[in-house]
C-alpha cells in the first residue's frame, strides 16, 4: 500500500505501471489536490484522467474506487485490498481533497470477501519449489503483445464484473452522463 496526493502520485507512476505489468496487487490512496504542477492543497478532481486512463507509460488500467465521504472512504479502502488480491492488479482509491479533509466517525467493517486464487506468483522463498520471478519486462518476439492481450482480457472482465455507479435524480432522464 502507498498513499499521497496528486504530485506525489505522479512521482509513483513508473512504479504503478511496473506493478500493473507484473500483475502485483497494490493499493494506492490518492487524495487529490489542485494543480497542475505543485498546485495547492485545496480540494480538486484533476487526477481523474491520470487514474482512470493509466497514468504511467504502457497499456494498463487500474481499478479506481471514488468515495464520496469518510465512511465510504473507509469501506472502499478495505475493499481495495480484496480487489487487488483477487485480480492481481493495482487498485486506486481516488478521493477529492475535500473528502480527505473531512472528519466524522466511521465504522471499520470487514469488506466483502472473495475466494482468492492461490498466490503461486508470490516470492516466498524457493525451498522445495522452482524459483519464481516478478517481472514486467518482456523481451522476445510476440511476448509483450501476448502479455498485453492477457491483461486486456483481465481489464474487460473487471469492467464487466466491477463497474458500479450511484444514480441520483435521473428518474425520467433520456440521457445520463457519468
Where are these regions (language model features)?
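Short glycine/serine/threonine-rich phosphate/pyrophosphate-binding segments
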Residues: 3, 8-14, 37, 73-76
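Thiamine diphosphate
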Residues: 41-44, 50, 57-59, 152-178
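Conserved thiamine diphosphate
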Residues: 43-97
Amino acid at each position: 500500500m502507498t498513499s499521497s496526493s496528486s504530485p506525489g502520485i505522479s512521482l509513483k507512476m513508473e512504479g504503478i505501471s511496473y506493478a500493473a505489468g507484473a500483475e502485483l496487487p497494490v493499493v494506492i490512496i490518492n487524495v487529490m489536490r489542485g494543480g497542475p504542477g505543485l498546485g495547492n492543497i485545496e480540494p480538486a478532481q484533476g487526477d481523474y484522467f491520470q487514474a482512470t486512463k493509466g497514468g504511467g507509460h504502457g497499456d494498463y488500467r487500474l481499478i479506481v474506487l471514488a468515495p464520496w465521504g469518510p465512511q465510504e472512504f473507509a469501506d472502499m479502502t478495505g475493499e481495495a485490498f480484496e480487489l487487488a488480491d483477487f485480480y492481481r492488479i493495482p487498485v486506486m482509491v481516488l478521493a477529492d481533497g475535500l473528502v480527505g479533509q473531512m472528519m466524522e466517525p466511521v465504522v471499520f467493517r470487514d469488506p466483502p470477501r472473495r475466494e482468492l486464487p492461490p498466490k503461486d506468483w508470490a516470492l516466498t522463498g524457493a525451498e522445495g519449489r522452482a524459483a519464481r520471478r516478478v517481472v514486467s519486462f518482456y523481451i522476445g518476439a510476440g511476448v509483450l503483445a501476448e502479455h498485453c492481450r492477457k491483461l486486456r482480457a483481465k481489464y474487460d472482465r473487471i469492467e464487466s464484473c466491477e463497474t458500479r455507479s450511484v444514480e441520483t435524480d435521473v428518474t425520467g432522464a433520456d440521457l445520463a452522463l457519468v
